[in-house]
Regions:
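Aromatic (phenylalanine/tyrosine) cluster motif
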Residues: 7-9
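Prokaryotic Sec-type signal peptides and long signal-anchor helices
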Residues: 11-13, 26, 193
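Sec-dependent N-terminal signal peptides
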Residues: 18-27
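Boundary at the C-terminal end of the N-terminal hydrophobic targeting segment
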Residues: 31-33
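Feature activates predominantly on carbohydrate-active enzymes
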Residues: 35-39, 45, 54-60, 68-239
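A short, Trp-centered hydrophobic/proline-enriched beta-strand micro-motif
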Residues: 49-51
Length: 239
């Protein structure tokens, strides 16, 4: 069967359109996966329009501050480095302190200019956060909104390796269920959030439970969000 030139022309045109759509979708996915944009918007609505964010390959973790027109340029080898650079700029150039209890700020309409390019780097490959006890002190009853703030705080301070225990209770429940333990036995063994640290360290004899079924589901869903956001930044979760 002969293929007409008109058919080939239309086929070629259709393929070009499909490729263009694919490239556009990839660009959109890339933009939406950039956590710095979301971080800036959470700090101050509209803040992302005041910065230029650039990634640049490097053998060491680094960030640079620069200026292009009326926009501040923050350059780094990964998103954690860039977030650290953002925190440095806000603190030492704009006079804005983002505290552990307050992660929002009113940025000036025109940001203070970076008059001279500035670079900072580190040879330390891992910056670790947290221990078991933290999860039963500060974090025991955090929701996603509070966890989102915490992950932002980690990135702003250069953390790239973090203990991530939320949802471990659900994993234990699922494993014990598959091994044939009853619901009552599991509930007597798995502790609540306020005691998780000591339970996981094997020094808890009992507690006043049990946990509701909805709590296990809630913890699992929360951990999925936590790990997803950590990986978007490039923070490695220690499970």
């Amino acid at each position: 069967m002969r293929i007409s030139s008109t058919f080939l022309f239309n086929l070629n045109l259709m393929m070009k359109k499909l490729i263009s759509i694919f490239v556009l979708l990839c660009c959109i996915a890339s933009l939406s996966a950039n956590p710095i944009h979301g971080l800036l918007e959470r700090i101050d609505k509209g803040a992302s329009k005041k910065f230029i964010i650039q990634q640049q390959k490097s053998d060491v973790d680094f960030f640079e501050l620069d200026q292009k027109g009326d926009k501040v340029v923050i350059r780094g080898n990964n998103y954690v480095s860039i977030a650290t650079g953002l925190n440095w700029y806000l603190k030492y150039h704009a006079g804005i302190h983002l505290s552990w209890n307050g992660m929002t700020a009113d940025l000036p309409e025109v940001l203070p200019a970076v008059t001279e390019k500035e670079r900072h780097e580190t040879n330390l490959p891992y910056r670790y956060a947290y221990n078991y006890c933290t999860f039963s002190y500060s974090m025991a009853f955090w929701d996603w909104e509070r966890w989102q703030q915490e992950i932002d705080w980690m990135a702003l301070h250069g953390v790239n390796l973090s203990l991530s225990l939320t949802g471990a209770e659900t994993v234990w429940k699922n494993v014990l269920t598959k091994l044939g333990y009853s619901k009552d036995e599991i509930n007597a063994f798995v502790s609540g959030s306020g005691f998780t640290a000591w339970w996981l360290m094997n020094n808890l004899e009992g507690w006043g439970g049990p946990n509701p079924d909805s709590w296990y589901v809630q913890q699992a869903e929360l951990q999925k969000k936590i790990v997803k956001r950590m990986r978007e930044y490039g923070i490695h979760p220690v499970l």
